[in-house]
């Protein structure tokens, strides 16, 4: 296609957009942003010539690699520890992808720029493709992995699991509230521009080190589309910056979007990489080192900081606090311990830690053993049924954590937990910023300006409240996390598939589970103050 014909074709596509001049169109997806002064630029024009042939080639490579993995016996070599965590990851990730596809009509409706609508429509096609190849990857794992239990129920389990619902909250953020907040700042400017680096670049590297070369093939194919999505987001961001009235909203949304992405993505991907690997070479990057390279240098310094020249206040404090939480406060390690504590209500198995693991963690995170080593030794000791309860119900010096109302990751850095009465309910938050998000950002007014499109953080956001006072065996049964024999749990605290060493419903029966947040709301003021003070001091034995 010649340059002239390309220009003509692009102009013809733009003509398909109809803008009524005699009536005000109905607003389907509201936004508090204004675009009256916005410049108009279309990032699609540069790739229109090759888009469909390019995507076809990428799909062919993905499905060819899947066929090659089966023929090459990849599943004889892949580490079980790694693939078990993929049961959780691959149950979650297709949902944010399809939510991103659903977000594009929101952006198209909210942004009055026919030029950019083409690029957003193509992004919608991308996101559907991403979700499709990820679902096919999950199906291939299920059909060929030694233990398909968990892979075969991921769509159901994702929606009712204490960890999966964190990912659901993350993906729903793309399609709820203010259309620009959700579909542009939260999704494109932060999630796709920053955190896909660790999701789709750093994590595939770890997969390959554990004998899984299918996940890198799929997710590098996904990541190759992200540059166009980043361009879409940046174009809308520049349009919003053209109107000074949008600046407070942009600064609000950057704080919310950055922090919620950090809380959720770093929790999940950090755990998958650090605790799902068997590769303990000392020169292998830790998640903290990956984060410094991919998030701090590649995104914060190269993308966020230059926005200051437009007069935006960048959330420097939150970037530094996220780094501090990962490096100094052990955020990823706290998340891994929490997931392992909850193993009876998992639909994946979590491996025990070895001396090699301990040595690597201490090398990468000096002081790790003093804080986490003893607990993991207890996890190893309590891994098999018969003589003990699940570790969550044993005296191992660990108190089951409170859930954060906003990001839904528990308040694992206990000294930072915020407790406030909001909308008539005592709520717990993992941080001051998550409290601000609920109490200030997602409200009908922000800094004296009406923001009716932001919505609220509502619903049953604390998984534990749904199962308060129930027997653990009944919870597992209700969730459906039982194997085909009708008694053996899907989740196990080890990787041994010997039926004699696997936990059953009878092994976990008799343990009553209580919600920390329900109990908190039942306390008197004095009881609550004492409880919160003890929790912030490090918690008491469960």
Curated annotation (Swiss-Prot):
Its EC number is 1.14.13.227. Fe cation 1 binds at residues 97, 127, 130, 226. Pfam families: Phenol_Hydrox. It is an enzyme of class 1 (oxidoreductase). Fe cation 2 binds at residues 127, 192, 226, 229. The propane 2-monooxygenase multicomponent enzyme system is composed of an electron transfer component and a monooxygenase component interacting with the effector protein MimD. The electron transfer component is composed of a reductase (MimB), and the monooxygenase component is formed by a large subunit (MimA) and a small subunit (MimC). Requires the presence of the chaperonin-like protein MimG to ensure a productive folding, resulting of a soluble MimA, which leads to the active form of MimABCD. This is Propane 2-monooxygenase, hydroxylase component large subunit. It comes from Mycolicibacterium goodii. The gene is mimA.
């Amino acid at each position: 296609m010649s340059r002239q014909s390309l220009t003509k074709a692009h102009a013809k596509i733009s003509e398909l957009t109809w803008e009524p001049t005699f009536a005000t169109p109905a607003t389907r997806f509201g936004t508090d942003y204004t675009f009256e002064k916005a410049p108009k630029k279309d990032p699609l024009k540069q790739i229109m010539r090759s888009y469909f042939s390019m995507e076809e080639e990428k799909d062919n490579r993905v499905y060819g690699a899947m066929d090659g993995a089966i023929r090459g016996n990849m599943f004889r070599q892949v580490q079980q520890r790694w693939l078990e965590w993929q049961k959780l990851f691959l149950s979650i990730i297709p949902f944010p992808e399809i939510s991103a596809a659903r977000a594009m009509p929101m952006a198209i409706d909210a942004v009055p720029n026919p030029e950019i609508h083409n690029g957003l429509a193509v992004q919608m096609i991308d996101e559907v493709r991403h979700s499709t190849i990820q679902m096919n990857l999950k199906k291939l794992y299920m059909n060929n992995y030694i233990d398909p239990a968990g892979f075969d129920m991921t769509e159901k389990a994702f929606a009712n699991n204490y960890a999966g619902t964190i990912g659901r909250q993350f993906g729903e953020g793309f399609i709820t509230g203010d259309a620009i907040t959700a579909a542009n700042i939260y999704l494109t400017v932060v999630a796709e521009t920053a955190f896909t680096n660790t999701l789709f670049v750093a994590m595939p590297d770890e997969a390959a080190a554990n004998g899984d070369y299918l996940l890198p093939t799929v997710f590098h194919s996904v990541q190759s589309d992200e540059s166009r999505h980043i361009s879409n987001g940046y174009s809308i961001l520049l349009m919003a910056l053209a109107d000074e009235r949008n600046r407070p909203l942009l600064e609000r949304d950057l704080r919310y979007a950055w922090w919620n992405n950090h809380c959720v993505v770093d929790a999940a991907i950090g755990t998958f990489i650090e605790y799902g690997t068997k590769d303990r070479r000392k020169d292998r990057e830790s998640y903290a080192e990956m984060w410094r390279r991919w998030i701090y240098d590649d995104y914060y310094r190269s993308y966020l900081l230059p926005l200051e020249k437009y007069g935006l206040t960048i959330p420097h404090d939150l970037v530094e606090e996220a780094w501090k939480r990962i490096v100094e406060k052990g955020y990823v390690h706290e998340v891994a311990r929490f997931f392992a504590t909850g193993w009876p209500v998992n639909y994946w198995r979590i491996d025990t830690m070895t001396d090699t693991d301990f040595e690597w963690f201490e090398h990468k995170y000096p002081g790790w053993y003093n804080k986490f080593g003893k607990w993991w030794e207890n996890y190893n000791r309590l891994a098999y049924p018969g003589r003990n309860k699940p570790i969550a119900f044993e005296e191992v010096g660990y108190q089951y954590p409170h859930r954060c109302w906003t990001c839904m990751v528990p308040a694992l850095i206990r000294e930072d937990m915020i407790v406030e009465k909001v909308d008539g309910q005592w709520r717990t938050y993992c941080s001051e910023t998550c409290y601000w998000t609920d109490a200030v950002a997602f409200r009908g007014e922000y800094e004296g300006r009406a923001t009716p499109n932001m919505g609220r953080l509502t619903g049953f956001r604390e998984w534990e409240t749904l199962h308060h006072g129930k027997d653990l065996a009944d919870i597992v049964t209700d969730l459906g996390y039982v194997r085909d024999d009708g008694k053996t749990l899907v989740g196990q605290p080890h990787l041994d598939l010997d039926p004699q060493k696997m936990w059953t419903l009878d092994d976990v029966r008799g343990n009553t589970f209580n919600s920390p947040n329900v109990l908190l709301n039942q306390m008197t003021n004095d009881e609550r103050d004492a409880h919160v003070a003890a929790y912030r001091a490090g918690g008491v034995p469960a």
